[in-house]
A protein has these predicted regions:
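N-terminal active-site segment of His-dependent metallophosphoesterases
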Residues: 1-69, 76
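Active-site neighborhood of phospho(di)ester-bond hydrolases with catalytic His/Asp-centered motifs
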Residues: 6-7, 44-48, 78-85, 107-109, ...
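N-terminal cationic-hydrophobic initiation segments that often serve targeting/anchoring roles
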Residues: 36, 72, 163-167
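Catalytic metal-binding/acid-base residues of hydrolase active sites
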Residues: 10, 50-51, 86-87, 134, ...
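Metal-dependent catalytic neighborhoods of phosphoester/phosphodiester hydrolases
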Residues: 50-67, 83-102, 108
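Conserved small/polar residues in nucleotide/adenosyl-binding loops
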Residues: 197-202
């Protein structure tokens, strides 16, 4: 299975007072979509931070809608999307159950997750564990695991919950959006937040 992994599109990014939507549209429409078509991609992954903020401008939402439609409806390629720390999980989850049969798998709110996304190729099933960014308190409440107090414990709980639904021997891909310990700050316009964890479960 040929999987194209992407992340951090940050659609609707405002850079020194200017929206980058036109530039982002060029990259997605003139580079990403032809790559999906020409390279025989079997599945596209967007691992979080679809938008630059939880309430994105309308132009950014329209761009994502257009690109997602072209990937799934025109190119007939499954598109798996999870929310990141910049996204609104509730907004990203909108109509997710309706869209999944069309090949657009949106994982935002934990309450709406039903388990791994399973795709097929000539070698059989591939299970995708879709793990959106979630604070430990949200994971603790949704999974009913009172012991979850840290981001590492939250990730381990989510991976354990989804992974337990995958039969032995099935190829598995983890799609997650999370902080990683040991990050180094750069001269970006916003300070980086380096909080978190490494996990044996990952």
């Amino acid at each position: 299975m040929r999987i194209l992994h992407t992340a951090d599109w940050h659609l609707g990014k405002l850079f020194y007072g200017n929206y980058l939507t036109e530039d982002q549209a060029y990259v997605l429409e003139q580079q990403l979509l032809p790559m999906i078509r020409d390279e025989g991609i079997d599945a596209v992954v967007l691992a979080g931070d679809v938008y630059d903020r939880s309430l994105p401008p309308a132009e950014a939402v329209e761009l994502f809608d257009d690109v997602a439609t072209r990937i799934t409806a025109d190119l007939h390629v499954p598109f798996l999307v999870i929310s990141g720390n910049h996204d609104s999980p509730a907004r990203l989850s909108f109509a997710s159950r309706l869209l999944a049969p069309q090949g657009l798998y949106m994982a935002g709110e934990l309450e709406r997750l039903t388990g791994p996304v399973v795709l097929e190729d000539d070698a059989g099933p591939v299970a995708f564990l879709t793990v959106p960014y979630a604070e430990p308190a949200v994971v603790r409440q949704c999974l009913g695991q009172d012991e979850v107090r840290s981001h590492q414990q939250a990730m381990e709980a989510l991976l354990g919950w989804q992974g337990s639904q995958v039969p032995d021997g099935v190829r598995t891909v983890c799609v997650a959006h999370a902080f990683v310990a040991g990050g180094v700050a750069s001269d970006s316009e916003r300070p980086l937040s380096c909080l978190l964890y490494t996990s044996d479960a990952a």
